[in-house]
């Protein structure tokens, strides 16, 4: 299960799961569900649960998607705003969950659950060799087309567009997109 599958990290985790032929994949997403839909294979049981319907509906949707099976693995690309609690309600007591926000205490899980936290900073220390191999694999994925970056959008006005971009992110008017600000498009830049 991938919670936050339309986020950048969630989308990348989803693509790696698909490439590894892991199915069924239960995803949780919202307004950007159409982005997630591009990667999943419903014929293999993959599905999307819409978090905008509320926590109770998410938990119910997860249980329905499991159809009596145990949820043994979860990747929480959100790690806040109810995702932790929702996962705790459906994850098997012998399961494992990985979070992406370090330094938090994740409560509500039995001691038998394997709780881990991962982030890209891990490859700068003891996992340098893994980071090198992994980045090469993702580069190959981009070249071969099985791995795709988040959609990008150039915000007009260069650095003058940063406030508008941040406002859009804060207000939730944009999702599943990465903003690009071209410094050279900033009025007065280079003069």
Language-model regions, residue ranges each:
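Terminal helix/beta-alpha structural elements that buttress the NAD(P)+-binding lobe
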Residues: 1-191
